[in-house]
From Swiss-Prot:
PROSITE patterns: ATPASE_A. It comes from Alkalihalobacillus alcalophilus. Key component of the proton channel; it plays a direct role in the translocation of protons across the membrane. The keyword Ion transport applies. This is ATP synthase subunit a. Keywords: ATP synthesis, Cell membrane, CF(0), Hydrogen ion transport, Ion transport, Membrane, Transmembrane, Transmembrane helix, Transport. Coiled coil: none annotated. It is found in: Cell membrane. GO terms for biological process: proton motive force-driven plasma membrane ATP synthesis. It holds the Pfam family ATP-synt_A. The gene is atpB. Its main location: membrane.
C-alpha cells in the first residue's frame, strides 16, 4: 500500500506535467505554421503559460493534500 500510494502520486504528477508540455509543443507548432509565424504563437503561449502556472499551483496543493491524507491514515493506524 505504501508503494502504491507513492507510485500513484508520482504518476499523477508526471502525467499532468507531461500533458502540459505536450500541449505547449502543439500550440507552438500550430502557431508557427500559420501566416503570422512566431508572432501568431506569442499570445496563445502567454495565455497558456498563465494557465499552466495556475494548474501547477493547483497540482502542488492536491499533491500536498493527498500526501497529508496518506500520512494521516498511517499515523491513525498505529
Amino acid at each position: 500500500e505504501e508503494f502504491a500510494n507513492t507510485l500513484t502520486l508520482g504518476m499523477r504528477l508526471f502525467g499532468n506535467v507531461y500533458a502540459k508540455e505536450m500541449l505547449m509543443i502543439l500550440l507552438v507548432g500550430l502557431g508557427t505554421s500559420g501566416f503570422l509565424g512566431a508572432f501568431g504563437a506569442f499570445l496563445p503561449l502567454i495565455v497558456w503559460q498563465a494557465f499552466g502556472m495556475f494548474i501547477g499551483s493547483l497540482q502542488a496543493f492536491i499533491f500536498a493534500m493527498l500526501a497529508m491524507v496518506y500520512m494521516a491514515h498511517k499515523v491513525e493506524a498505529h
